[in-house]
Amino acid sequence: MPHSTNREMILGIVVGTAGISLLLLWYHKVRKPRTAMSLPKFLSLGNSLDLMTLQDEMPSGQGTTAIFQGRQLQILEKLNELLTHMEELKEEIRVLKEAIPKLEEYIQGELGGKVTVHKISPQHRARKRRLATVQSSATSNSSEEAESEGGYVTANTDTEEQSFPVPKEFNTHVEELNLDALIQRADNLRVNESRKVESFELLCDHKEKFRDEIEFIWRFARAYGDMYELSTNIQEKKHYANIGKTLGEKAIMRAPKNGYCHLWYAVLCGYVSEFEGLQNKINYGYRFKEHLDKAIEFLPEEPFLYYLKGRYCYAVSKLSWIERKMAATLFGNIPSSTVQEALQNFLKVEELQPGFSKSNYMFMAKCYADLNQIDSAMKFCNLAVLLPCITKEDKDAQKEVKKISTSLKR
C-alpha cells in the first residue's frame, strides 16, 4: 500500500475516533445532572420569594397567587436551562470544528516530520518584542499564575499559549517618565489602533511607580479594555476583562466624582458580563447603566458616553419577552427603553462631535429604519460609508450598513 494511502487511512481513523469520543463525551455530559444556573437558587437578593412560607402565611387567594408565581419560576427555569444547553451545544460544535482541522494538521506534521505552526495573538507578538532574548515555550502544557497589573492575583491559566502581561523583572531598558509625560505618551499611542498594545506595555512598565495615581489607574483599566478588544482568545479576554474591572472598582472607590473612572468601569462591567450566566448578565447590565449615568453627570460633553447609552437603550428596546420576564423575576423591575430614546442619544453624539464614528451613523440608520423613516435611514447609511474603516468596529459597522441599505432598497 502506498505511503500516502497509509497516512490518509491513519488520519481518517484518528479523526473519526476523536469525533466519536467527543460525541460520547457530549452525550454523557448532557445526560448528567446539570450545574446550569437554576433561577430560584439565585433569588436571595433581600426581597427573595420564599414560596413555602408564603403559602403557609397567606390567605388562600394569595397562596394561589404564590403557587402561580412558583410555576412561572419553574417555567422560566426550564426555559433558561434549555437556552443554556443550546449555548453549550453551540460552543461544543464550535470547539469541535476548530479541533478537527488542528488535529489533522498535527497528524500530518507528525507523519511528515513537520513542525506545527500556531497562530499568534497580539499579546504573543508584544511579548516577543519585549523578550527578544528569552525563548518562549510554545508547546508547554504547564499552567502559569499571572499577577494582575493592579496588584491582584488571578486564577491559573490553562496553558502557556495564553500569553498574559510580562512580569516586571523581564522588562529591560524601561525609560522612566514622570506622570504627565507618561499619560501624554500613553494617550498618543492609543490614538493609533495598531499601537494600543504598545500603550498598554508602557503603562505596565510604570505600574509600580504610579499605581496609586487616579489618572494612571483609570487609564490602566482602559488599557485592559483595549487588550480585551484586541485579543481573540477566550481565556485572554476573561483575564483582561476581570483585571480591568478590578482596576475600575479601585478607581471609582478612590475618585467617585471622576467621570472617566465611572466610564471605564461601566465598559469593563460590560466585557465581564459576556462570560457570565443570565442573572449576572442582567446584574452587570444594571451596573453598566448606573455608572454610565454617573459618568454623564460628571462629563456631560463627552460624546462617547452618549454613544454607549444609545447602544444600551437600543439593546434594551430589543429585549424579548422571556428576557424581560427573567429580569423582572430576578430583580423586581424590568429594564425599559425605546428606539426613540436610543436615537436621541445617537443624535446627541452627532451634535457634540459630527462624524464621531461609522458605528454611530450605523445605529442612527437602524433606529430610523425601525421607526420607518426610510429617507433618514438611507441618509445615515450614506454618511457611514463615507467614513474610513480603521478599527475592527468600523469594519463590522461597514458590513451592517450594507445589510441595512440592501433591506431599505427592497
UniProtKB/Swiss-Prot annotation:
Q: Which domain of life is it from?
A: Eukaryota
The protein's topology relative to the membrane is: Single-pass membrane protein
Q: Where Phosphotyrosine occurs, residue numbers?
A: Y152
Q: PTM Phosphoserine: at which residues?
A: S121
Residues annotated as region Disordered? Answer: 122-153
Where's it found, cell-wise? Membrane; Cytoplasm; Cytoplasm, Cytoskeleton, Spindle; Cytoplasm, Cytoskeleton, Spindle pole
Which GO molecular-function terms appear in the entry? Answer: microtubule binding
| UniProt-listed InterPro entries | RMD1-3_a_helical_rpt (IPR049039), TPR-like_helical_dom_sf (IPR011990)
Primary location class: membrane
Keyword list, A-Z: Coiled coil, Cytoplasm, Cytoskeleton, Membrane, Microtubule, Phosphoprotein, Transmembrane, Transmembrane helix
Membrane-crossing ranges are 10-27
Give residue spans, biased composition: Basic residues. Answer: 122-131
- List cellular component terms (GO): cytoplasm; membrane; mitochondrion; mitotic spindle pole; spindle microtubule
Q: Name one Pfam family in it.
A: RMD1-3
Q: Which residues form a coiled coil?
A: 71-109
**Modified-residue entries (Phosphothreonine), positions:** T139, T154, T157
Q: How does it assemble?
A: Interacts with microtubules.
Q: Which family does it belong to?
A: Belongs to the RMDN family.
Q: Supply the name of the protein.
A: Regulator of microtubule dynamics protein 2
Organism, scientific name: Bos taurus
Give me the gene this protein comes from. Answer: RMDN2
